[in-house]
Amino acid sequence: MEQISFHQENFRRRTRYTAVFLILAVVFCVVTVLNINTGNVHIPVPKILRILFLKEGAATEYNIIWKIRLPRILMAALLGGALSLSGFLLQTFFSNPIAGPFVLGISSGAKMVVALTMIVYLKYIGRFSSYTLILAAFIGSLISTGFILLMSKKVQHMASLLVGGIMIGYICSAITDFVVTFADDSDIVNLHGWSQGSFSGMSWSNIRVAAVVVGLAVLLTFFLSKPISAYQLGEAYAQSMGVNIKTFRVILILLSSILSACVTAFAGPISFVGIAVPFLARKAFGTSKPIVVIPGTFFMGAVFCMICDLIARMALAPVELNISTVTSILGAPIVIYMMIPKGGRK
């Protein structure tokens, strides 16, 4: 009888996982079509399908889809998934659902070093590559993360650590503003546009670079599913299962920093996605199993950022909102809900 009950429960879980992934896949397809369909130039769905699959159509519409809208959509999906997974790794590391690259100042650290790099390169060299920005953002992420790790050894309460992370973010932002004060006007325009956060202006070369970096990080994260699962049950249990805690924690931070750095390098700082989406994924799938939550978080983050980008483009068209404006409006209430005690818990 117990065996039958176990099989029934297992079947229900698998059905739920499959249903959620199917819903996400459908929403992904619908939002993709809407993103291509809407804009200053409206393109009917039949034309979209012909251009995408048969590569037939007017030159103007063809270029709008293949050179502007499709790269933007794919980049929003790729970076949205990366940022969500970065948040999941930080939440695993700190064992706290409020931990995220934006809240802990990691995105601000990446922004600071990228800003310095952009100003120096534009002033003395004239141009920079995508790899240069990713490396700069990664270094900035590690700087902020290093300070947070030092604080974590001295601070006992997670709330104090989170406040410390926010302060680090403010310090990095202040340094960025100070540097911008002495930059040329043309450099300030480039930096200001990037620092507001946006998926616009993406190219296929950007996608190729981001896909390699994010793809490798996601693959490594997925291979860590079993150690993460053990770590979620406590360090003592993880050690008993053969997990080298120090090495494992370093890998978590490095992967999270790489993912966050890639997002910041291409799209600028984006808020609340890294906190809200992992929470939504765990709620939707009804489990904390990494083997389910890791791909679920990435996929849900992709869909979430695609929806946010669509809202940013169309809410006040032809004026485009900053992507962080939309992610904050949608993500902040979710974070507030997370912090409200449930079931009388204080």
Question: Model-flagged regions — what are they?
Answer:
Residues 1-346:
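Alpha-helical transmembrane segments in inner-membrane proteins
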